[in-house]
Structures are given as C-alpha cells and as structure tokens.
Amino acid sequence: EGLYYSYGYYFGKIHVDPNNSNKIYTYGVPLITSDDGGKTFYTIGKENVHADHHDLWINPNKPGHLINGNDGGVNITYDDGENWIKNNSTEVGQFYSINVDYQKPYNVYGGLQDNGVWMGPHNAIPSKRWNMTGKYPWKSILGGDGMEIQIDSRNPNIVYTGSQFGFYSRLDLETGKRRSVKPVHELGQSPFRFNWQTPIRLSSHNQDVLYYGSNFLHKSIDKGESWETISEDLTKGGKLGNVPYGTLTTISESPINEDVIYTGSDDGMIYITKNGGKTWKNISKDLPQDLWVSKLYASSHDENIIYASLDGYRWDNF
C-alpha cells in the first residue's frame, strides 16, 4: 500500500545501500524499502515518523543505521526501521504565518509547514518539565499545513484558519466546533484557483467581514456563511499543472478606508479598488514583472500608499 498512494513531487528520492546493491530505499510521502532489488517493497515508517520524506542517510559502516529527515523533523533508527527515535532537540519547524490575539496574557498563533496550527500564551517558558507535569503550554488547533490565522478581536475564541489550497474554517475554541468557510464556484463556472498559501483577511473595520483570495477576491459579510465575488480575475490567468498558478497570494485592506483594498498574485499582479470592489485598477505595470507578490501592507497614515514585497527565488532570482 505504500507504493499505491505515493508520489515523488519535489522531495522524492531513491537510495541504494552502499554495501548491498539489493537493498533499496525510496521515499516521497511514505518511506519504503526493498530487500530484493526492487521486486517487492514494504513500509518502514512507524507511528512516530512523520510523512513526506526529504532525505535519508545510510551508515556505510553499520547496517540498519539510518537518519531520516521529514516534514516532522529528524528520526533515527538502528534496526532498519523496526524502531525509530524521534529527535525532539532539533528545532526545525517552519512557520508560514504568525498572529496574536488581544487576551491578557495574549496568545501567539502559528501556522506550520505540515505541522498544523498551534497556539499558546506569549509568556510560556520553554521547558521540558511538561514531560513530568503533562501540561504543555502550546495547543494544536488544526492539522495539515497550517496557513494564515485571523482572530476576531471581539471574541478571541473565534479563529479563522486552515490548511493548504484554501481549506479554511471558522473555529470556536470554546466549544471545539468547526465550520468550513471556503467559497465554492457556481455550477457551470470554472473552479476557483487557490494558492498553496491562500490569503484571508478579517476586516479591521467590521469583524463580520472576511476577505478570501482565489484568483478572484471574495467577500463575506456574515463571518464566512455566504460569499460574494467582488472582482474579476486579478491574475494573468492560470497555467496547466498539478499546483494551481495564477492565484492571489496576499490581501491588504486600508486601515483608514474600508473601501480601499489591495491584492497581490503569484504572477506579479497588484490591484487596487477604491470603491469596495466595484472597479479595480492594475498598479503593477511599472514594477519588475512576473515576480511573486509575497506581501502587501496598506499604510496606516495614507490610504494611497501601499508597501509591497516581491520575490523571485522560485526562478533563481535572488
């Protein structure tokens, strides 16, 4: 079954044991091995080994000694995967986003690459004593790839967050209830394109208003219960592939004027509306082209000023 659902994606690799040409290790989502030169395979990842494997070191001097790097960190085995040690001393979590609420003490929220969304008090003291007390100060509130987090400033128990490709929900931390808020295209309409890190934004002017980016900008005035698409396609259009392209990557609402909204896309487009989405203008024509708009921040002092960051590392442009 390990082969059936696996794919290479960008991290799939194959290794051959340096001392045994019939011993093969291959990995992508699972970590599997063969003892007969690839005729048969079996899984060697165990319950404490995270999926999505990126690297493997095979000890040339000690058969069965492996060090595995995966989306959950580092695991070590001395018996060829029968038992694994989880290396918890290596801090390798990668945050996609961070936010805070207004409680006292305030909580910090973080969306982590393939390790979900976590929250905890800002004054939590890092300590391994929780292993004895059982009281870990940080709490997981969502799984998958943890993406953006928006907290209702009127009620900090209401949190909007989600995982990859735009699967966001409205969480009630007090009751544990969760409701999907993802916009859905109409019958006969082309499906929306959602970025891996789909942007969302709660309005600072009205916390019932939520903005959601696909290749369009969507607006809800009832906390994500219903949606209105308030723009045309704000990208250059999609491209064929297994990962959506031509998608919005960032949204910024002016803290001065609720009708002024900016969007940025993965293909370098920055748009502005000054009338709440009735009309839009491309303001990126004089910028370097085809770069990823990584973040937009509307000025708190002048509604006509926007701060933008663009990157091109995906095209080796540093």
Give a label for each model feature:
Residues 1-318:
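Beta-propeller blade termini and top-face loops
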